[in-house]
Regions:
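Soluble acyl-CoA-dependent acyltransferase catalytic core bearing the H(X)4D motif
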Residues: 1-9, 29-51, 55-355, 364-368, ...
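Generic N-terminal amphipathic, Lys/Arg-enriched alpha-helix
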Residues: 23-29
Length: 401
């Protein structure tokens, strides 16, 4: 297989790290209760279950091309840390470590934990995989039902280009936490039960809100509660950059970067249910999948057109004028999952940070309907990570009865 040019999205993500501005490593953590597997057994399992993925054999070298290689070496790509630390400490350390050539930029780490538990951390360069790809790989690694495809917009009508371009207009404002991103990471998470999330979704008299609407409304409230929206929190201009999956309807397990981002205004209302109502109205009114697919088509049309204009557009998308923070969500729609005798208890998505944006928030729902809310910041904002994580859980609970 000959080398292939990176897609425009892959190349843009690759350029962030190649230019020396940021580490573009992201991760997905799977937490378990039970006996951890032997390292050799985990390596054998990964080599067997992921052997069919050509994407895991790709390396980038020093250019903007994917270079195929032999089947991945499980001894290199699957390991466990040698130093003693908690799973949380290992996770924060590992997602701050950049990948470099010549090997494919991904690794799976077995992280021993206290009280008979453990975690797996799948981390990768964002140019190679996106969050959905990481979830697919973890689902394939574990034992359990086949994952159900995510809900996607119908494909009867071709996507329109205009909504995607409209979404590029300025809509954000600088916030107190914006600024240069340092080289270390802080991670904090909190858990929301299925009952709490269901009660929050049923909080509006107008009808059931989506789980994502609850997540975004909770983020708006947590930012306000932490003082992260400035001295005048009622001002507009706080926007979430929301990745939307644009994979074909019949290929939800496709690896790589197959998403586009859509901005969702985060309301400044002082009351939790008013914030949820505002987000719910926006997400119902705006065709998010159609807009995302239109934007994906526009980005794909830039292939081979790198120049001053595309570089300026990339810098703008990274700026606080475009969006305030990343808010990404995933859902594991399969049934209970296990790794040998150990049961999966939760998943957490740990995104890479973009230039000038030292804060990102994610939600991952499991098959029971429970969710893990995760905050990733750079080291300088580590206090904000812990504060927002606690506030996110409080905001979801506040929406219930």
């Amino acid at each position: 297989m000959p080398p292939t040019p990176m897609s425009p999205l892959d190349a843009w993500l690759h350029s962030h790290q190649a230019g020396g501005s940021l580490c573009m490593t992201f991760g997905l953590v799977a937490r378990f209760v039970g006996e951890p597997p032997a390292l050799d057994a985990l390596r054998d399992r990964a080599a067997h279950r992921w052997a069919h993925h050509d994407r895991l054999r790709m390396s980038s070298g020093t250019g903007l091309r994917w270079i195929p290689g032999p089947p991945f070496d499980p001894v290199h790509h699957v390991g466990t840390p040698t130093r003693r630390a908690s799973p949380d400490e290992h996770t924060a350390h590992l997602i701050a470590r950049p990948f470099g050539p010549p090997r494919p930029p991904w690794q799976l780490h077995l992280l021993p934990g206290p009280d008979g538990g453990f975690a797996l951390l799948l981390r990768a360069h964002h140019a190679l995989l996106d969050g959905r790809s990481a979830l697919v790989l973890v689902q394939e690694l574990l034992d359990g039902p086949t994952a159900l495809p995510g809900q996607r917009a119908g494909s009867q009508a071709p996507p329109r280009r205009r909504p995607g371009l409209t979404d590029l207009l300025p809509g954000g404002r600088p916030l107190p936490f914006h600024g240069p991103v340092d080289s270390r990471r802080a991670v904090a998470w909190s858990a929301v039960t299925a009952g709490e999330l269901t009660a929050a979704r049923d909080a509006l008299p107008s009808g059931r809100a989506s789980a994502n609407a609850v997540f975004l409304a909770a983020t708006a409230g947590a930012l306000r509660g932490a003082g992260a929206t400035g001295r005048l929190p009622f001002l507009p201009g706080v926007c979430a950059m929301v990745p939307v999956d644009v994979r074909p309807d019949d290929d939800g397990a496709l690896l790589g970067n197959h998403y586009a981002t859509v901005r969702v205004p985060l309301p400044s209302h002082g009351r939790a249910r008013r914030r949820l109502a505002a987000v719910d109205r926006f997400t119902r009114r705006v065709a998010l999948h159609e807009r995302a697919r239109a934007q994906a088509r526009a980005v794909a049309g830039m292939a081979g057109r790198r120049g001053a204009l595309t570089e300026a557009l990339g810098r703008y998308v990274d700026s606080s004028l475009y969006s305030s923070l990343l808010c990404s969500s995933l859902a594991d729609r399969g049934g209970p999952r296990t790794l040998g005798p150990a049961a999966l208890t939760g998943l957490a998505l740990l995104p890479s940070l973009s230039p000038g944006h030292p804060l990102a928030v994610t939600m991952v729902r499991d098959a029971t309907g429970a969710a893990t809310l995760t905050v990733v910041t750079d080291h300088a904002r580590r206090v904000l990570a812990g504060r927002l994580s606690a506030l996110l859980r409080e905001e979801v609970r506040a929406l219930g009865p």
